[in-house]
Curated annotation (Swiss-Prot):
Keywords: Ribonucleoprotein, Ribosomal protein, RNA-binding, rRNA-binding. This is Large ribosomal subunit protein uL18. InterPro entries: Ribosomal_uL18_bac-type, Ribosomal_uL18_bac/euk. GO terms for cellular component: cytosolic large ribosomal subunit. It comes from the Bacteria. It holds the Pfam family Ribosomal_L18p. CDD domains: Ribosomal_L18_L5e (cd00432). GO terms for biological process: translation. The gene is rplR. GO terms for molecular function: 5S rRNA binding; structural constituent of ribosome. Part of the 50S ribosomal subunit; part of the 5S rRNA/L5/L18/L25 subcomplex. Contacts the 5S and 23S rRNAs. The keyword rRNA-binding applies.
């Protein structure tokens, strides 16, 4: 008999793989990955061709803590989206592939996407 928490985590891994099997980021069009936990939000620009993170921002970063972006809510998520768009513009990145992972495109995930779009990223 399997544990219900094991089943839940297994389903989460399957959802993430289902989304990521069609998404590939490159240096011209990196992958915008969004991960949320119970307390924090992490956003990264990833170049999958070399396996390197180009830029990242989160509610754990020192710059976010200094500007008061420490809680996990929709306002903070939108600010993180605009901040990652600004970092992407500094790297001459204007187009990205959005990777929502195993999460629904709703709430915090949607607000990160909206903030990134308002910041100038296209996807």
């Amino acid at each position: 008999m399997e544990n219900s928490l094991f089943k839940k985590s297994e389903k989460k891994i399957r959802r993430a793989l289902r989304v990521r099997k069609v998404l590939r980021g490159s240096s011209l069009k990196p992958r915008l990955s969004v991960v949320k936990t119970n307390k924090h939000i992490y956003v990264q620009l990833i170049d999958d061709s070399i396996g390197k993170t180009l830029a990242s921002v989160s509610t754990m970063a020192k710059s976010s803590k200094a500007s008061g972006l420490t809680k996990k809510n929709q306002d903070v998520a939108k600010a993180l989206g605009s901040k990652i768009a600004e970092l992407g513009k500094n790297l001459q990145v204007d187009r990205v592939v959005f990777d929502r992972g195993p999460f629904k495109y709703h709430g915090v995930i949607a607000m990160v996407a909206d903030g990134a779009r308002e910041g100038g990223l296209q996807f």
